[in-house]
A protein has these predicted regions:
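Intrinsically disordered, low-complexity non-transmembrane regions of multi-pass membrane transporters
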Residues: 1-14, 20, 27-29, 191-236, ...
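Structural signature of hydrophobic alpha-helical transmembrane segments
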Residues: 11-25, 71-84, 134-141, 260-272, ...
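Hydrophobic transmembrane alpha-helices of secondary-active transporters
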Residues: 26, 53-60, 74-101, 271-280, ...
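C-terminal ends of transmembrane helices
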Residues: 29-41, 87-99, 189, 276-290, ...
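Flexible hinge motifs at transmembrane-helix junctions and intramembrane kinks/re-entrant loops
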Residues: 33-49, 61, 66, 70-73, ...
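Entry/N-cap segments of selected transmembrane alpha helices
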Residues: 93-123, 175, 239, 295, ...
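Juxtamembrane and boundary regions of transmembrane helices in multi-pass small-molecule transporters
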Residues: 124-131, 175-219, 333, 341-351, ...
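Alpha-helical membrane segments and immediately flanking helix-loop junctions
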Residues: 125-166, 170-173, 177, 189, ...
């Protein structure tokens, strides 16, 4: 651990192992608080989000009142993120994609509509408040649907090419807001819909997961706490597939840089996972051990979320001007109304639709890992939703980035 004085702030640089230890510590705190506080369980708040928020608030207090900050190792967080998206790809058997079929396409339509609405709200309010319309785009789908990675990439473009000063900082702050809100509103909105429409009865989590027949073909991230029996051989072969997919993803990111098919590394990881899975299974007739993929995927998901929130600099939100905070809260209200009215109705007004709403809230304001955590929290309380675990990871991790990139590029080209 290195210590540096930055201005009047003492900054501690935490290495990869220290970062992992702290992330696990706060993850367990989140798990403990959820188990002890009925409010968190009743509103289906994810354990990594609760633990990560405690960490972020602790960091905020240390920074504001004691002039102490910490810089955590970002490489291990990136690896965990790529492992999560790779697990989504490796779980995407083409037969499962066919199973998603019509529902996947309908949900994608909802997502596309919301991206357009989100940008319309952001840019309209920015104009009404006397700001550049492109600032409204930053507090629209660039950061709220796109997340921190998209915020950084487009922020640099808007600063250097379109003269939007502070676009990167604004983008990071807005993405931070979205990540927090996305993890907080999904569960409560889904609970409201379930209760109002009497869609499901609360079930005991232990009965739902531990007594489930392990032969049942479940979607990735479904039943995250179910006992999964794996061997060392299965673990090694699965780890090899993860390593291959992430290696190819990194290479494709370099090859595609500056070209028309340029995509974020995590999208390449997901896509490579889909190809590897289906090539091995349907061409080479290799048996894929899904339980090992599920274990790696769920572990990386929890740790990544904990680390992402651990690294949040909440004091950036304090620097947002009043008009921008107004836009962000308006976006939150629009998200809740859109998902509760449009997404829920279009997806069938049933239990699966309510769980899909929780997922849509997750990546509509935050990120795909938040969406998965949301639907895990809801299904832990009300029972399984195979459709949600099938649709949300694919739509949130793959299709949404392509849709968002096209929409953002079109708007910038028009207003630029």
């Amino acid at each position: 651990m290195k210590i540096k004085l930055i201005g009047n702030v003492m900054n501690y640089e935490i290495d990869a192992f220290g970062t992992l230890v702290i992330a696990v510590f706060f993850l367990f705190i989140g798990r403990y608080l959820v188990s002890k506080i009925s409010f968190f369980r009743n509103y289906n708040l994810p354990e990594p989000v609760i633990g990560g928020l405690i960490a972020a608030i602790t960091a905020f207090i240390l920074y504001k009142f004691f002039n102490i900050s910490a810089t955590f190792d970002s490489e291990i967080q990136t690896i965990l993120m790529l492992m999560f998206f790779t697990s989504v790809g490796l779980s995407a058997d083409f037969t499962k994609l066919k199973e998603g079929g019509k529902s996947l396409l309908i949900f994608l339509v909802c997502v596309i509509l919301f991206v357009v609405v989100q940008n319309a709200v952001g840019m309209s309010l920015a104009t009404a408040l006397g700001l550049d319309p492109l600032i409204g785009l930053i507090v629209g789908s660039v950061t709220l649907t796109g997340g921190h990675g998209t915020a950084g990439a487009w922020g640099e473009v808007l600063e250097t090419q379109y003269g939007i000063q502070g676009a990167i900082v604004l983008g990071m702050a807005s993405a931070t807001f979205g990540l927090v809100i996305g993890g907080l509103v999904g569960g409560p909105v889904a609970k409201f819909l379930i209760k109002r429409n009497q869609l499901a009865e609360t079930v005991a989590q232990e009965t739902n997961e531990q007594q489930l027949d392990t032969s049942i073909n479940t979607a990735p991230f479904e039943y995250p706490k179910k006992t999964r029996l794996i061997t060392a051989s299965n673990a090694v072969s699965t780890l090899g597939m993860f390593a291959l997919c992430i290696f190819v993803a990194n290479e494709m990111t370099e090859i595609s840089q500056g070209r028309w098919f340029e995509l974020p590394t995590f999208v390449w990881a997901l896509g490579t996972g889909v190809i590897v899975r289906n090539f091995l299974e349907h061409v080479l007739k290799v048996d894929i051990f899904d339980r090992a993929i599920d274990v790696f995927g769920n572990a990386s998901l929890s740790l990544y979320l904990s680390m992402a929130l651990l690294s949040l600099q909440l004091w950036l939100l304090a620097d947002l001007a009043g008009p921008l905070i107004t836009i962000l809260f308006a976006q939150t209200a629009v998200l809740i109304l859109f998902t509760a009215i449009v997404t829920f109705r279009i997806m069938g007004k049933n239990y699966d639709a309510a769980v899909l709403v929780a997922g849509h809230c997750g990546f509509g304001m935050g990120a795909t890992p938040t969406a998965i955590a949301n639907i895990q929290a809801v299904t832990n309380s009300y029972g399984p939703s195979h459709k949600a675990f099938l649709i949300v990871p694919l739509c949130g991790a793959f299709f949404i980035d392509i849709v968002n990139a096209v929409v953002i590029q079109s708007i910038i080209a028009f207003f630029g």
